[in-house]
Amino acid sequence: MDMKKLMLVLGLCLTLTAAAQENPLATISHDPGWCTLIHRWGFIGDSLCSGEHEYTRADGTKVWHDVYEYSWGQRIVAAVGGAVGYNFSQGGETAKGWIRNFWDYPMNRNADINAQSYPCQAYIMALGCNDKHHIKVGDARKDINLEDYTKNADTFAGYYGGIIQRVRTLQPKAPFFVVTMPNLYGDKEFSAQIRAMADIFENVYVIDLEKYGPDYDTPEFRARYFLDGHLNAAGYQLTAWMFMTYINWHIERNLPAFARIGLLK
C-alpha cells in the first residue's frame, strides 16, 4: 500500500472513531456515573415513563397496567442509591393533558400526585408518543411565550415548553433531560420540536433516542424487551441504562453547570 492510500485509510479510521465517540450510546453502561450527583428526580411522561405492561387475556381482551416500580425512572433511582424519584406520568398522557392532570388539577392514576408538591433537582421528560395523534406539532420558536406561558400556542411545542416553564417556577435552576421518541413510536417533526427546547431554554439537554437509540422494531429486540405493544421489565431496565449513560455523557461535558446541584432543595 502506497503512502497516499495509507493516509486515506488512517483518515477514514480516525473519522469513524470520532463519530463513535460522539455517539453517547455507543457503549451502554450499567453504572450510573455522574447521575449520582442528582438525589431527587422527577419523571414526566406517558406509559413508557410509567413502566406500563401490556398483555392479552385468554379471552383476547387487552390489559394495560402502569407498574411504576418497574419504570425506567425507578430503575435509575435504584441504581443511583440513596435517591428518590417521582413519576409524574401515566399511560396515554400528552403534553397538554399533563398540565391538567399533574399540575393544574392533579387527577391521575399515580395516586393523584401533584408535581407542584415535589420539586426535584432534575427532570427527565419523555412525552410525544400520544400527542402526535391529537394535536398539531407547531414551532417552538414561535409558539412559546417566554414571558407568559399562559400565552403559549395550542400546539405540542407550546404545551411541551409550557411544562418546562411551569416547573421552572418551582425550580428555576433544575436541569431538564428531554427525550426524543424512538423511531418505532416517533415522528421526526415532533422530535425536532423536542430538540428545539435545548436551544430555547438554558440547562436543557437532549436524550436523542431517535438518532442514537436502538431499532425497537427488530424481531430480536421485540422478543427480548417487549410484552405485546409495550416494553417488559427488561426493556425498562435497558432504557434506564441508556438514560443513565446519556445523562452521564451530558454531565461529563457540562460539569460546571451542575456545580450547585447539591444546593437545589
Question: Which residues fall in each region the model found?
Answer:
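Positively charged n-region of N-terminal signal peptides that target proteins for export
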Residues: 1-6
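Hydrophobic h-region of N-terminal signal peptides that target proteins for export
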Residues: 7, 11-19
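Serine-esterase "nucleophile elbow" of acetyl-processing enzymes
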Residues: 21-89
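Alpha-helical scaffolding within the catalytic cores
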Residues: 27, 69-73, 98-116, 158-166, ...
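Structural recognition of the beta-strand scaffold that forms the well-ordered cores
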Residues: 40-45, 49, 84-89, 121-127, ...
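Oxyanion-hole/transition-state-stabilizing segment in secreted/luminal serine hydrolases
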Residues: 95-154
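Active-site segments of SGNH/GDSL-like serine hydrolases
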Residues: 129-130, 160-194
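Catalytic His-Asp segment of secreted/periplasmic serine-dependent ester chemistry enzymes
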Residues: 181-265
